[in-house]
Amino acid sequence: MNLRRLLLGLLPLIAISFAEHSYGEDLTAEFDAKHKKCLERIAEDNELAFEEAMIWQDDGGGRRAKHCVAMALYALGHEDEAAHRLDALAKASDGGTPAMRADFYSEAANFWLVANKPDRAYKSATDGLDIKVDHLDLRIARARAYAMSGYYEYAEIDLTSVLGFDPKHAGALRYRADARLQQGRLSEAKADIENSLKSDPNAVETALLRGQINEAIRKQK
């Protein structure tokens, strides 16, 4: 699945996660509801969502408004600016709890990856992991940044760490299979890709990667 479409499809879940981490006197149910509505608006009309989010931000919408602005920018195709704003939000005085800041860094890292800027993705992911070392999405994002830069051994280390927390994580297994394929370790890549498909049998990208691994094994014989 295209990463952009996948991330946009997760907007409602992001809104729920944002609300679950909301603490403090200024984090009202009304603001949570407005943030959720703002994210949902992106799927309907991303230009209008951006305009409304900017107005809300100027009216004192705080981190929720800033977050929605960034997500709308991403939907409009401005991955760099969206990632930059999320990095800034994670560092800001109104960035929220450590868990929320880590989530902002995770979104930023994934947006940098879409923008094909692995160095920036690595920085965002590492900054997030400094806050929350067991954040699996951050560790996967950093592994993907390593792989995009050709550092497959380092990518494998991060992915193995993810699998230490969640041995059946389909995404981590798939990415590690690819890292091992790139290193020519075909039997290990084959084992990972089969386990990934067991965890998520309908994953098209995983099935395609299995085909590549099987072809590499065939050519090696």
Can you annotate each of these PLM segments?
Residues 45-48, 79-85, 115-124, 149-161, ...:
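Structural signature of tandem alpha-helical TPR/SEL1-like repeats
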Residues 55-56, 88-89, 127-128, 161-162, ...:
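Canonical positions in the second alpha-helix
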